[in-house]
A protein has these predicted regions:
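Active-site-adjacent pocket-lining segments in enzyme domains
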Residues: 1-25, 29-125
Length: 125
């Protein structure tokens, strides 16, 4: 998550994919990359989207349990919500979400369900 939200090249690729109606798939903290679409005064292209994201409440605890070496410098869910995203999960669980061409999974626990959802969605389209 560190560095990717500030990378204008990531934002360019994501805007290109959205313009081409291609699917974007993220897991856990992956939606942090979506923040890059808002760089250089560009509008945030995922405003009003629903998604599952690793919860900020769990990020606050991860250094204590050894998941991360230190505290996150900012709160991902908070930033996404401030940009108009509707976070549909509260826990770091196996929940997934699909909204338009964006497919998301809440945490590593969602990897299997996310893979199934992505595969089935791509096969249908």
């Amino acid at each position: 998550m560190l560095g990717i939200p500030e990378d204008p090249n990531v934002g360019k690729v994501l805007r290109w994919a959205k313009d081409k109606d291609l699917y974007t798939i993220t897991l856990c903290h992956g939606p942090g990359a979506l923040l890059s679409t808002n760089l250089d005064a560009n509008p945030f292209i995922y405003k009003d989207y629903k998604m599952t994201v690793f919860p900020d409440t769990v990020d606050k605890q991860t250094p204590m349990i050894g998941y991360l070496p230190g505290h996150m410098p900012w709160r991902l869910c908070e930033k996404l919500t401030d940009l108009g995203v509707k976070i549909v999960n509260k826990k770091s669980d196996n929940s997934t979400c699909i909204d338009r061409q964006l497919i998301t999974g809440a945490s590593p626990l969602a990897a299997n369900e996310l893979g199934k959802l992505a595969a089935n969605t791509l096969l249908q389209n």
